[in-house]
């Protein structure tokens, strides 16, 4: 950044730091203790769909790499497209196998980034679920979203019932609980709703 950037109030964009994803397992322990949320075992990487053989090759390689994991149980890695035209590469692991799920997400992001598709990466999300509301737990679902281009996390908690409403109170409680574990996105207007994301 130069002097002119400082005078005009411009800021330098934060470089993505994919290693921040590895803080999720310890953050999950905090979430369970603070707001009774546990991992669902589902995580996904969202990217803008690109047409072309090069991108298809990378996508196939990443999928084959993750499916080759001998320890993987359950369904293979899948690719879903949402109503907005974005693609989600979805990995499913056991609910207590969060470190392996995080490694999957890191591998997908790293592969796309190293092959020149970093600008297409949007976010990664790991799903969590709460206990029944009647027992004093959080209830419902929550996604911890990693914004690739900002290098930050934020919580997204859609309310059950099919409407497009979010549980803002739960999101703020999660932000407070994880302040020491994750780099939380400070600008609330960047806490984009990811309606229909896999695992939520």
Feature map (PLM): residue ranges:
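A short linear-motif detector with a strong N-terminal bias
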Residues: 22-27, 66-69, 101-105
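Terminal interaction module
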Residues: 18, 116-200
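Core of folded catalytic or high-affinity ligand/protein-binding domains
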Residues: 72-130
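Charge-rich, low-complexity segments
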Residues: 1-55, 166-200
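N-terminal start-of-chain detector that recognizes signal peptides
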Residues: 15-20, 59-62, 96-98
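A glycine-rich, hydrophobic loop/mini-helix early in the fold
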Residues: 33-88, 94
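Conserved NTP-handling cores and scaffolds of large molecular machines
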Residues: 11, 66-70, 112
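Generic structural motif recognizing short loop/turn segments at the entrances and edges of beta-strands
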Residues: 2-3, 14-20, 25-27, 39-45, ...
